[in-house]
Amino acid sequence: MVNLSSLAHRTGAIDFDDLQSTRSYRPWKAYCQSKLAMLMFALELQRRSNGAGWGLMSNAAHPGYARTELIANGPGAHGLLWRVNRLFQPYISQSAAEGALPTLFAATSPQAKPSGYYGPDGFYELKGPPAPAKIMPQAKDAAAAARLWDVSAMLTGVSFDSVPAAA
């Protein structure tokens, strides 16, 4: 199973007191939190699979800086970030198809590892061929990941408690 994260996980934090941003919604903060949560989910899913004998492989990937419409249509579109983006984009980004390669690597490569995280191998992981990516310390917090798992199960009504071990 591959979870799609982002370089934005690096500045993310899980706000357990306002997990769904109902008291204070800031788009970039919510995006960073969601991408951190996706990476934490991937790592926690692998821990739980290992412990329960589910026999699945969970990892994550990020596209680097792929040329999509995220910045053009997201918060602050046509602001300073958008103008800087337009200026430097040709030098620091890659096509959307190239951005998909780390996800394909994580899903199909025999070199992909459980609890692995993959992204572009270039400058600041912005572009380049797929390679192991840096996982920030907050994503490795097993206690926070377990708490997030439990809260997610409660909010969604989905539980994995009855999933049998792989035969």
What are these regions (language model features)?
Residues 136-167:
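C-terminal amphipathic/interface module of NAD(P)-dependent oxidoreductases
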Residues 11-15, 134-140:
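Short, exposed beta-strand "edge-strand" segments with a Pro/Gly-rich flavor and a Y/T-containing core
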Residues 17-25, 78-86, 127-135:
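Short glycine/proline- and charge-enriched loop/turn segments
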Residues 34, 85-133, 140-146, 150:
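C-terminal helical subdomain
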